[in-house]
Amino acid sequence: MTNIRKTHPLLKIVNHSLIDLPAPSNISAWWNFGSLLGLCLMIQILTGLFLAMHYTSDTLTAFSSVTHICRDVNYGWLIRYLHANGASMFFICLYMHVGRGIYYGSYTYLETWNIGIILLFAVMATAFMGYVLPWGQMSFWGATVITNLLSASPYIGTTLVEWIWGGFSVDKATLTRFFAFHFILPFIIAALVMVHLLFLHETGSNNPSGIPSDSDKIPFHPYYTIKDALGFLVLILLLLLLVLFSPDLLGDPDNYTPANPLNTPPHIKPEWYFLFAYAILRSIPNKLGGVLALVMSILVLAIIPLLHMSKQRSMMFRPISQVLFWILVADLLTLTWIGGQPVEHPFITIGQVASILYFSIILIFMPLASLIENKILKW
C-alpha cells in the first residue's frame, strides 16, 4: 500500500512541498531565511490576533488600550513586545533573504522574484499601518508625514490624501481603517507566500554555485527540516533576548507620549527598518522627486534581472561584483544611520552621496562589473 502522504489530496501537497521535495545538496544557511520568514509571519499573525482582542481602534482609547494590554492583560506585555520586536526580526530576515537573492542570482526566477517584490511592498505597508495603531506621537506624525507624500501626485494629490485620511487630517477614520487594513493584510501576505512557493517549486531552489543542481538532489526531509528547525531555535532565542531584556531598544521614546496634533516631535522618523528609504526620500529637495526616489529604492529590485549581464548566475566566483555587493550593503547601513539623524550639515550631504551611490551600484556599476568579469573569463 502506498503511503497516505503520497495519495491523500491535501497531504500530497504538503508532501511535495516539505517532505519529498528534491532540494540541492549544497544550499547554505542563507537559504534558511525563507522558512524563518514563514515563522515570523505565523508569530505576527498569532500575537496580532491576541492583541486585536484587547485593542480599540478609537483615537480616544487606542493609546489607553495598549497601556491596558501591557499592564492588565495576562502576559499582555509579552504579546505586545513579541509583536513589536517580531516585526524587527521579520525585516532582518526579509533584507537577508533579498540580499541572498541578489548575491546568488536567484532573481533569474522571474515569477518568484516579482511575487517577492510584491510581498516586500505588502509587508512594508502592513508594518507602517501597524506603527500607527498605538496612537503615540510618532504614530500620529509618522502617519501624517507618510500619507502626505501622496499629495505630491499631480492634480489628484490633495483629493487622494483626504480620501485616504477619511477627513481633513489624520483622525479617527484614519485609525479605524488602518486597523482594518493591518488586520487583513497578513492573510493576503500568507496567500501571496503560497503563490511565491508555487512558482519556486516550478523551478526548484537555486544554490550557492548558481549551477543547475538537478544531478545532485536530496529530500527536503530530514535534511532541511532539521536545518530549518535549528534556524527557528536561533530566531526565537534572539527574539526572546530582545523582548525580555531590552524590548524598547528599537522603538522610539516619543511613542510613549499620546498623540497630540498640536505638538510636533523634534525629529519625525519611522522605525529603523524604513530609515534607509526615508533617507533616500529626504535627500531629494523636491517633494515629487523624493517620493519617486522612495518608491524606486524598492522597485529597483524589479530591474535587477534585466541588468544581469554576467555569464555566471551567482556572485560566488565573481570578485568584482562581490566587492560592489558589500559596498552596497555598507551603503544601505549608512543610509539607515542617516535616516535617523536630523536634517542638517553634514548629514544632508552624506545622505545625498549615499543615495546616489545606492542607485549607481545597482544600475551602473554592477552590470559594468559583470561585463568586465565576462572579459576576464576569456583571459
From Swiss-Prot:
Primary localization class, coarse: mitochondrion
Cofactor: how and how many bound: Binds 2 heme b groups non-covalently.
Pfam families xrefs: Cytochrom_B_C, Cytochrome_B
Alphabetical GO biological process terms: mitochondrial electron transport, ubiquinol to cytochrome c
Superkingdom, taxonomy of origin: Eukaryota
Transmembrane segments: 33-53, 77-98, 113-133, 178-198, 226-246, 288-308, 320-340, 347-367
Keyword Transferase: no
Annotated positions binding heme b b562: 83, 182
Keywords: Electron transport, Heme, Iron, Membrane, Metal-binding, Mitochondrion, Mitochondrion inner membrane, Respiratory chain, Transmembrane, Transmembrane helix, Transport, Ubiquinone
Note: Heme 1 (or BL or b562) is low-potential and absorbs at about 562 nm, and heme 2 (or BH or b566) is high-potential and absorbs at about 566 nm.
Name listed for the protein in its UniProt record: Cytochrome b
Taxonomic source organism: Sylvilagus floridanus (Cottontail rabbit)
Name of the gene this protein is made from: MT-CYB
